[in-house]
Design a protein with these regions (language model features):
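Conserved beta-strand/loop subsegment of P-loop NTPase cores
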Residues: 91-96, 122-135, 159-172
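Canonical P-loop GTPase G-domain recognition
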Residues: 136-204, 210-212, 232-234, 355
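Short, flexible boundary segments at extreme N-termini or domain junctions of P-loop NTPases and their
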Residues: 1-20, 53, 153-160, 168, ...
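A charged amphipathic helix-loop-strand protein-protein interaction module that recurs
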Residues: 197-198, 228-282
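Short hydrophobic alpha-helical segments used for membrane anchoring or interfacial signaling
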Residues: 213-219
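Switch I (effector-binding) loop of TRAFAC-class P-loop GTPase G-domains
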Residues: 33-61
Length: 355
């Protein structure tokens, strides 16, 4: 297959990353996509004009990320002579506010100008507003500061024609798991077959009798989706998925340091954690995903689950999004009158019982 043919099969989604200069856009991009750690982003310089990144995510889903410099001269250019070029065919706008900004009113004017241009050329796009650097706000003031900023932003969005469900707000900081949480929501919105994936994971979780399954993208360690069963739904650690993302990133950095390779190139076959109350393993599911499995504290069930996940790999191969394959799966599901992926996982179940 030629490069041109391959590119046509890739599903490209244009994502704008915008905000005033110094808001933290490039820092978060470097942490999520370039495997930086928080303490290292201080040496990053300001973004000049637009930095384009084509990021392959889960196979043929290509994120066309535009990191737009926030200096006034660049913003003026985006809104005037580059207006149609920048704001056309946008799937997602991620706008970053610095909660500690001394020019909050000016920031809001810039935001209003931005979404006005977005509504002109991409009125159906989704807006994720990241209220960033929340670590700089005293603990007792965080909720109030977030509520006030969200109210101001939502009012502006409604004035410019964006309905409530088109806009999401997330408080973020590079120093905790909140950054992974916010970007996970962005990725979940962009993945076109998330419901298909969840249906298949639910069947697999039932087969394994797993407490929880979490699907991670291998390069970024972002959560794609998860399935939680039974009492695990009452787990008080609501940020546990993002904590695992952070642990995986740290583990990759440690491996890179000891092997002399780049963190983005590091991979591992499997990681296991065993306690008296539960057992956990994370392993490759497809070329571009890892699956974390939380099991009861039973060695036999744990080992059976590891085998069954290996058997499941072939059935989950179409998660590495190929449009033609995805459409065929959906067409077959419509013909059968069942949810996409159900018959696939039933096959896994039969194999597991035979084993």
């Amino acid at each position: 297959m030629s490069t041109t043919e391959r590119s046509k099969r890739q599903k490209q989604r244009k994502v704008l990353l915008m905000g005033r200069s110094g808001a933290g856009k490039s820092s978060m991009r470097s942490i999520i996509f370039s495997n930086y750690v928080a303490k290292d982003v201080r040496r990053l310089g300001a973004t000049v004009d637009v930095e384009h990144s084509n990021i392959r995510f889960m196979g043929n889903l290509m994120l066309n990320l535009w990191d737009c410099g926030g200096q006034d001269s660049f913003v003026e250019s985006y809104l005037s002579n580059q207006r149609s070029h920048v704001f056309s065919s946008v799937a997602v706008l991620i706008f970053v506010f610095d909660i500690s900004s001394k020019v909050a009113a000016s920031d809001m004017v810039s935001f209003a100008d931005t979404i006005r241009a977005l509504h002109e050329f991409s009125p159906n796009s989704k807006i994720f507003v990241l209220i960033h650097k929340m670590d700089l706000v005293p603990g007792e003031q965080k909720a109030r500061a977030l509520q006030q900023k969200a109210h101001d932003v939502r009012t502006t969005c409604e004035d410019e024609g964006f309905l409530g469900q088109q806009v999401e707000f997330w408080a973020t900081s590079i120093w905790d798991q909140s950054l992974y949480k916010a970007w996970t929501q962005v990725i979940y919105f962009l993945v076109p077959n998330a419901t298909v994936i969840e249906n298949m994971l639910e069947k697999l979780a039932e087969l394994l009798d797993a407490r929880e399954l979490i699907l991670y993208e291998r390069t970024t360690c972002l959560v794609v989706t998860h399935v939680t069963r039974g009492s695990e739904g009452r787990n008080p650690y609501t940020d546990r998925f993002e904590r695992i993302s952070s642990i995986l990133k740290t583990h990759k950095h440690s491996m890179a340091k000891h092997t002399g390779t780049m963190a983005s190139e590091v991979s591992f076959a499997e990681m296991q954690i065993k306690t008296g109350e539960f057992m956990f393993f994370i392993t490759r599911l497809t070329e571009n995903t890892n699956l974390a499995v939380v099991m009861p504290g039973d060695e036999a069930a744990f080992n059976a689950a590891r085998v069954n996940v290996q058997l499941a790999r072939q059935e989950f191969a179409h998660l590495d999004i190929m449009e033609k394959k995805g459409k065929e799966v959906q067409r077959q599901a419509d013909t059968r009158g069942s949810a996409p992926g159900e018959d696939d996982v039933d096959t896994i179940s039969s194999q597991a019982r035979l084993s």
